[in-house]
Design a protein with these regions (language model features):
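Active-site beta-to-alpha loop of glycosyltransferases that engages the nucleotide-sugar donor
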Residues: 2-13, 34
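Short, acidic, metal-binding catalytic loop of nucleotide-sugar glycosyltransferases
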Residues: 16-25
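A conserved acidic beta->alpha catalytic loop
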Residues: 24, 30-40
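Short aromatic/hydrophobic "clamp" motif used to bind/position activated sugar donors
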Residues: 76
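The conserved acidic donor/metal-binding loop of glycosyltransferases
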Residues: 80-84
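Conserved donor NDP-sugar-binding/catalytic core segment of glycosyltransferases
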Residues: 87-119
């Protein structure tokens, strides 16, 4: 799931890259936290995602909670819409979780477009 606040092309790239990121069945939910409803709705329709929210800016955390509220999947991934998934990367993240059942939260290695490591998890 992702929280979209007036996304541009990054939402389209995010959704398009998900197909190669996993061989698993995906349920994709977008919390619409901004005013670009047409952009969010069109991208969701192209990629089989569901949109929740009416564009009210609830803040990131409340938007994420809204998107996750009705999910019953074993794994819930919260990702920013400016992320581009590498092929197999979501499978690798879920496999790490399966290999470490005591883990309550997992964080992937994030890379900048130039390949350098982004300092996440600060």
């Amino acid at each position: 799931m992702t929280v979209a606040f007036n996304p541009g092309e990054e939402l389209e790239r995010f959704l398009a890259s998900l197909a190669a990121a996993t061989a698993r069945r995906l349920v994709v939910v977008i919390a619409d936290n901004g005013t670009e409803h047409d952009v969010v709705t069109a991208a969701a329709q192209r990629h089989g995602a569901r949109v929740v929210g009416d564009g009210t800016n609830l803040g990131y955390g409340a938007g994420a909670n809204l998107a996750a509220a009705d999910l019953e999947e074993d794994w819930i991934v919260v990702a920013n819409p400016d992320l581009v998934w590498k092929p197999g990367s979501l499978d690798a993240l879920i496999d790490a979780g399966l290999a470490n059942p005591a883990a309550g939260c997992l964080g992937p290695l994030l890379l900048n477009p130039d390949g350098t490591v982004y300092p996440s998890g600060r």
